[in-house]
């Protein structure tokens, strides 16, 4: 089995540091988890928030805590630390070799995309960011591990690209066009999405 992970990132215009943090952690019972958090607003304060959330989550995952429980614990910690005044989005994408599934954990209004052959599914059921209350629960989707399965995970910067000009980025259409034209590597797919967003 081969797992490929690709990341593409650019700083927000006129901001020295983004609020995004991404880490990969090995799961003690086999597999890997990719943890992506985005702190509210931008700059050092947002970065500190996303780093705190990611540290909490990867620490718990490394101890064998389930993804949903790790997300809830991170939300409670953020709510307690910031008194409910700061939010943070969170996505966890896990390859769980114990259950033989892909586990998608979302506390993020921004959708995830699942690509399998010619089929592209958008996971856009409304999800609440971390830190808004003490009882925040993530949305969890489990998929069987399959060859050529692609999970597209992103922060809201991609979603909001082009909105001010009235031409918001259409992630689904970009994915469809890229996947139809070629058999792109994960890095090519990530770079293409980012390039289209920057162009807008």
Region roles according to the model:
Residues 28, 46, 97, 117, ...:
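Short, function-defining helix-loop hinge/capping sites that tune catalysis or transport
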Residues 8, 122-123:
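Hydrophobic residues at beta-strand termini and immediately following loops
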Residues 42-63, 149-200:
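Active-site-proximal, acidic helix/loop segment immediately C-terminal to a metal-coordinating Asp/Glu
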Residues 47-117, 124, 187-200:
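Catalytic core of PPM/PP2C metal-dependent serine/threonine phosphatase domains
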Residues 15-32, 90, 123-169:
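Acidic loop->beta-strand submotif enriched in PP2C/PPM serine/threonine phosphatases
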Residues 1-18:
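Regulatory cytosolic signal-relay segments
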């Amino acid at each position: 089995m081969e797992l490929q992970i690709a990341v593409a990132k650019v700083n927000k215009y006129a901001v020295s540091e983004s609020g995004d943090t991404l880490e990969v952690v090995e799961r003690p019972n086999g597999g890997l988890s990719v943890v992506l958090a985005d702190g509210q607003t931008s700059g050092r304060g947002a970065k500190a928030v996303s780093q705190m959330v990611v540290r909490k989550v990867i620490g718990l995952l490394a101890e064998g805590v389930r993804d949903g429980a790790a997300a809830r614990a991170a939300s409670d910690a953020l709510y307690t630390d910031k008194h409910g005044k700061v939010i943070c989005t969170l996505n966890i994408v896990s390859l769980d070799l114990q259950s033989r599934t892909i586990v998608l954990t979302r506390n993020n209004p921004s959708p995830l995309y699942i690509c399998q052959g010619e089929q592209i599914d958008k996971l856009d059921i409304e999800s609440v960011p971390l830190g808004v209350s003490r009882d925040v629960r993530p949305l969890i989707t489990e998929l069987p591990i399959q060859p050529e399965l692609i999970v597209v995970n992103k922060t809201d910067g991609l979603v909001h690209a082009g909105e001010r000009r009235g031409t918001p980025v259409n992630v689904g259409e970009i994915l469809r066009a890229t996947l139809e034209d070629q058999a792109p590597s994960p890095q090519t797919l990530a770079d293409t999405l980012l390039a289209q967003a920057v162009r807008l």
